[in-house]
Amino acid sequence: MKKFFLFFVIIILAVYSITAEESEVPFTVLITEPSDNYSIAIEYTEMLSEARFIYSCDSKLFDEIDAIKIVRDRLINFTKEKGYYSYSYLRPTITKTDYATHKTYFYSFVLLKQ
C-alpha cells in the first residue's frame, strides 16, 4: 500500500511539473516624459497589442482637456514607434484622484492596430 501511494504521488508530481507554466504578466512598463507638472506611464502588452496610458499630476494642476491632449500626442508617437498604423479605445477613459497623495490619474486603454 505504501509503494502504491508513493508511486501515485510521484506520478502526480511528474504530471504537475510537466503541465505547470509560469504565470508572468507580459506587461512592459515604460515611464516617459517626466515633467515638473506631470508624468506618463505606458503599460504595453505586445502579445495582445494593447496599451494603457496613465497620466498623473498634482490634483490642483489637473485639467482633463490637457490630459487628453498630452496622452493623445504620446499615443500617436508610441503607435509610430512600435510600427502600428492606427488605434482604437478599448473602453472609456477613467479619472481617479488619490486624496492621500494629492495626485490625479487619467487612464486611457488602447488597442493598437496594424
Where are these regions (language model features)?
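Sec-dependent N-terminal signal peptides
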Residues: 4-13
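C-terminal segment of classical bacterial N-terminal signal peptides
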Residues: 14-19
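Secreted/extracellular ectodomain signature
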Residues: 20-114
